[in-house]
Amino acid sequence: MKLDKSRKLYAEALNLMPGGVSSPVRAFKPHPFYTARGKGSKIYDVDGNAYIDYCMAYGPLVLGHANEVVKNALAEQLERGWLYGTPIELEIEYAKLIQKYFPSMEMLRFVNTGSEATMAALRVARGFTGRDKIVKVEGSFHGAHDAVLVKAGSGATTHGIPNSAGVPADFVKNTLQVPFNDIEALSEILEKNEVAALILEPVMGNSSLILPEKDYLKEVRKVTAENDVLLIFDEVITGFRVSMGGAQEYYGVKPDLTTLGKIAGGGLPIGIFGGRKEIMERVAPSGDVYQAGTFSGNPLSLTAGYATVKFMEENGVIEKVNSLTEKLVSGIADVLEDKKAECEVGSLASMFCIYFGPTPRNYAEALQLNKERFMEFFWRMLENGVFLPPSQYETCFVSFAHTEEDVEKTVEAVSESL
């Protein structure tokens, strides 16, 4: 596989940007490839190689690359302008559409990133409860802000820095941690501390793919309510992915606050946080918890997000993508069994992960996965024309643009790569 131009570009980038990239997970060794364009289920690099893409920009592109409906909607909005600094009607229409699928979000606010959404949700929770301490799950990833950079997943774990330097100890002393799928540990920590909120990914997607065990989320809801602790579901990944109403609809659990992103922006930057009206009314200018942003609710992100969700609604996207994912995962599982490979495959909806080791149930078990073997597998898959997220700790995504032919080629690539 020829990657000469990508290699040269990366060498130049190393002198211009830390690690040569704008986000750490993109800096896989010995160098990343540079993308020239994307269309449908594929991306094409600057050296002319084509790849079936299961990274899908780490989740936002549920319709695939350069979807025509989204592209046309953006083109129409561009003719009218792309930033005003005033409210627009689409804010109202999109808010109502989101509430249709996330009724727990009685009021909501548009922001610019998932990180911004979780940061604001935690601030609101602290303001509403008058308490400082929060609880997060070990290995969960809620963005790159100080309160949650403690045993953080995603690129933080991939690059060996789950606890970031530069975060004051006095600040993170208010961030408590519990293992995923351990209701006893959660109960104990909530009973012993004055906690404002528990924030968690209902399905962990940044320490590989880790599913909640039976009734775990319902028990989480019960114990947080008993201790008067707000429950925040970080559905940046699972929102409009696990179901149209996210993991809270899929598992039948209603949080107090929810954060959305990724799919909700249709491939453009977005974050959304919302929840119970009495909590959200504390957000400025209605209340005393300040949050603001120049680009919040910008026309382009709202246009792409609204067009994406409407397309999903009108075309049964989730059902079709889930069905294709089942075929893909079944094919991979057959290959793993035939090869007697020391790895497993797990999935939920249109998310899947190939584990080089036993399927984990928490962060500690995810750390035991063989990340070196995974990266060997990653490069072999790339050579066979398939792009997976370049980390054992990331989740793969299937899109509406993927085809039966893509599935067949991917299963063949897995067989050859192993």
Curated annotation (Swiss-Prot):
The keyword Cytoplasm applies. Pathway: Porphyrin-containing compound metabolism; protoporphyrin-IX biosynthesis; 5-aminolevulinate from L-glutamyl-tRNA(Glu): step 2/2. InterPro entries: 4pyrrol_synth_GluAld_NH2Trfase, Aminotrans_3, Aminotrans_3_PPA_site, PyrdxlP-dep_Trfase, PyrdxlP-dep_Trfase_major, PyrdxlP-dep_Trfase_small. GO terms for biological process: protoporphyrinogen IX biosynthetic process. It comes from the Archaea. PROSITE patterns: AA_TRANSFER_CLASS_3. It catalyses: (S)-4-amino-5-oxopentanoate = 5-aminolevulinate. It is found in: Cytoplasm. GO terms for cellular component: cytoplasm. PANTHER family: GLUTAMATE-1-SEMIALDEHYDE 2,1-AMINOMUTASE (PTHR43713), GLUTAMATE-1-SEMIALDEHYDE 2,1-AMINOMUTASE 1, CHLOROPLASTIC-RELATED (PTHR43713:SF3). This is Glutamate-1-semialdehyde 2,1-aminomutase. It comes from Archaeoglobus fulgidus (strain ATCC 49558 / DSM 4304 / JCM 9628 / NBRC 100126 / VC-16). The lineage of its organism: Archaea, Methanobacteriati, Methanobacteriota, Archaeoglobi, Archaeoglobales.
